[in-house]
Curated annotation (Swiss-Prot):
Protein name: Potassium-transporting ATPase potassium-binding subunit
Cellular component annotations (GO), alphabetically ordered: plasma membrane
UniProt cross-references to InterPro entries, sorted A to Z: KdpA
Assembly with partners or alone: The system is composed of three essential subunits: KdpA, KdpB and KdpC.
GO molecular function annotation: P-type potassium transmembrane transporter activity; potassium ion binding
Organism superkingdom: Bacteria
Record key words, sorted: Cell inner membrane, Cell membrane, Ion transport, Membrane, Potassium, Potassium transport, Transmembrane, Transmembrane helix, Transport
Compartment(s) where it occurs, according to its Swiss-Prot or TrEMBL record: Cell inner membrane
Family statement drawn from the similarity comment of this UniProt entry: Belongs to the KdpA family.
Stated role: Part of the high-affinity ATP-driven potassium transport (or Kdp) system, which catalyzes the hydrolysis of ATP coupled with the electrogenic transport of potassium into the cytoplasm. This subunit binds the periplasmic potassium ions and delivers the ions to the membrane domain of KdpB through an intramembrane tunnel.
Organism listed in the record: Desulfovibrio desulfuricans (strain ATCC 27774 / DSM 6949 / MB)
Length: 583
């Protein structure tokens, strides 16, 4: 237990120490302030603007900014869909994989364009090297850049005083890729290669098995194909950009994507690094670092609580595994200095602590990569990752999207506090009026509406229910998790159901699109409304939004919205399964 505590403390300490300076750096980058890297890459930036025909100084209103987001995403979606369907005709396909079906290609394109990275396929057997590099890896960069760009449009709206314009989308996205995502990914890729992650273009290699197996038909299996390919260059942006789509089907549980405890710690740090840093970026850009620290503190408290709960649930394991009433495995606990606990679906090189910490981190942010199989967690251990997504992916959340989602909850909290004391709500010197509240409510309720509607439709589809590998509460949990992952733009999965069908690929694609672009539209409209307001000096009755009381209120509102929205569904799934297990 002591080792687990030290491992978690080391991770959280490193995260905080790295996030602070990175947050200040990101703020300088996105506002075009001079800095050391700009001297080297400024010619490249200017060349990109000339190529696109863009004036980076041109200001956009929210409608123009949103139109650019939609146009860029639409072109990306069409291009990626075409690439996946035609990959069998293109080079860099040493395994001669066939083109993806229209519904799988569409689902995958939507998934990567929306920063969800839901995967209804196993990458090593379905995608060519060209598709992995020119298609999926490129989207790992640009989809994350879209989130950062939208966040900065909101920041400019908050700090403006009667001004117009939210910045330039093309300049914001270019700077996010060129100065933030590319340099960090390059450094991380080199570190991963040093740890043993492959980066090559060779064909898969056949390795002789130490213990040959027999197939179902009795044929001997003496060799195994070992996937090769450009894996390190995809793993780094998948983690840093909160994307999560792995080169291999089992993601970072695969020893090639995540071979050592050191690579595991590095990839976990990359999960949360930019979302955590953006909290400090926000504080620096509005001129009050206390605001960013308060938001970081609220996120940090929720994350550490989730990690503690998940670790405890997995250490306690299942009380019994029985067949015909006879206990086959005695209860175990990981607290007695042994491996113990629920090790099903986990890599022994990571253990319970590394697996539970990753599961909490990957669902707190909208990453979705895994180093263990969430479907094999205990009912309560698997419920926590689900709840973290259902809260709206605002506990650090996606790159950019997590913080702008959290700011919507901040406005909701300020509004509720204003109602209690009978004052017009204010945030950072700006009065929060009905229009801003309507947009904040759209952001806060999009995730619950999309998830519950999608999950309900899936439960009504006989082909989905019939495809479940597990019955009763756990089967329902698998359906709810799939809808949650798509609607919250996370991408992780419980598995257990056949996702690669036309119905599910299309339905989950619709959920991903709604979960991504409805909040973006509301955030940009809110930013435009805030930009037109004058900043008023704080008065004696102004609610402080950077003290412990406000942090508590913010956490309470986040949990209240999540609990009211999803408790009935959770009661039918993981909670019912836990009661069945312990009765």
């Amino acid at each position: 237990m002591e080792n687990i505590i030290w491992q978690c403390l080391l991770y959280l300490s490193l995260l905080t120490a790295l996030a602070w300076p990175l947050g200040k750096y990101i703020g300088k980058v996105m506002d075009g302030e001079p800095f050391w890297l700009q001297r080297a890459l400024a010619p490249c930036e200017r060349a990109l603007y000339r190529l696109m025909g863009v004036d980076p100084a041109e200001q956009m209103g929210w409608k123009c900014y949103m139109a650019c987001v939609i146009a860029f995403s639409a072109v990306s979606l069409v291009a990626l869909t075409a690439l996946l369907m035609a990959q069998h005709l293109l080079p860099l396909n040493p395994r001669n994989v066939s083109g993806a079906s229209w519904h799988l290609a569409l689902n995958t394109a939507i998934s990567f364009v929306t920063n969800t990275n839901w995967q209804s396929y196993a990458g090593e057997s379905t995608m060519s090297y060209l598709s992995q590099m020119a298609g999926l890896t490129v989207q790992n960069f640009v989809s994350a850049a879209v989130g950062i760009a939208v966040l900065f449009a909101l920041i400019r709206g908050v700090r403006a005083s009667g001004g117009i314009g939210l910045g330039n989308f093309w300049a914001d996205a270019t700077r996010a890729v060129l100065y933030i995502l590319l340099p960090l990914s390059l450094v991380m890729s080199l570190l991963l290669i040093e740890q043993g992650v492959p980066q090559n273009f060779t064909d898969y290699r056949a390795a002789a098995l130490l213990e040959p197996l027999a197939a179902e038909d009795g044929a001997p299996i003496t060799h195994q194909l070992v996937p090769m390919g450009p894996q390190a260059s995809q793993v780094s942006p998948k983690q840093l950009g909160t994307n999560g789509g792995g080169f291999n089907g089992v993601n970072s549980a695969h020893p090639h994507e995540n071979p050592t405890p050191a690579s595991n710690m590095l990839e976990m740090l990359a999960l949360l690094l930019i979302p955590a840093a953006l909290c400090f970026t926000f504080g620096a850009k509005i001129g009050d670092m206390r605001q960013g620290v308060a938001i970081f503190a609220a996120m940090f408290i929720l994350l550490t609580s989730a990690v503690s709960f998940t670790v405890q649930a997995e250490l306690n394991a299942t009380p019994q595994i029985a067949q015909g009433g006879q206990v086959l495995v005695a209860p175990q606990s990981g607290l007695q200095g042994q491996a113990g606990g629920n090790m099903e679906g986990k890599e022994t090189r990571f253990g319970i602590a590394g697996s539970a910490l990753w599961a909490s981190a990957t669902t707190a942010v909208s990453n979705g990569s895994v180093n263990a199989m969430h479907d094999s967690f205990t009912p309560l251990g698997g419920m926590i990752p689900m709840v973290l997504m259902q809260l709206g992916e605002v506990i650090f959340g996606g790159v950019g999207s997590g913080l702008y989602g959290m700011l919507a909850f901040v406005l909701l909290t300020v509004f509720l506090a204003g109602l209690m004391v009978g004052r017009t709500p204010e945030y950072l010197g700006k009065k929060i009026e009905p229009f801003e509240m309507k947009m904040a409510v759209v952001v806060c309720l999009t995730t619950p509406v999309v998830i519950l509607a999608g999950g309900g439709l899936m439960c009504l589809a006989p082909q989905i229910v019939d495809s479940l590998n597990n019955p009763l509460p756990h089967g329902f949990s698998e359906i709810l998790y799939a809808a949650t992952s798509a609607g919250a733009n996370n991408g992780s999965a419980f598995a257990g159901l056949n996702a690669n069908t036309p119905f599910l690929n299309v339905l989950l694609g619709v959920l991903m699109l709604a979960g991504r672009f409805a909040p973006i539209a509301a955030i940009l409209a809110m930013a435009d409304g805030l930009a037109g307001k004058k900043i008023c000096p704080p008065g004696a009755g102004t609610l402080s939004t950077c003290n412990g009381l406000f942090i508590f209120l913010l956490i309470f509102v986040i949990l209240l919205v999540g609990a009211l929205s999803f408790f009935p569904a959770l009661a039918l799934g993981p909670l019912a399964e836990h009661l069945q297990m312990t009765r």
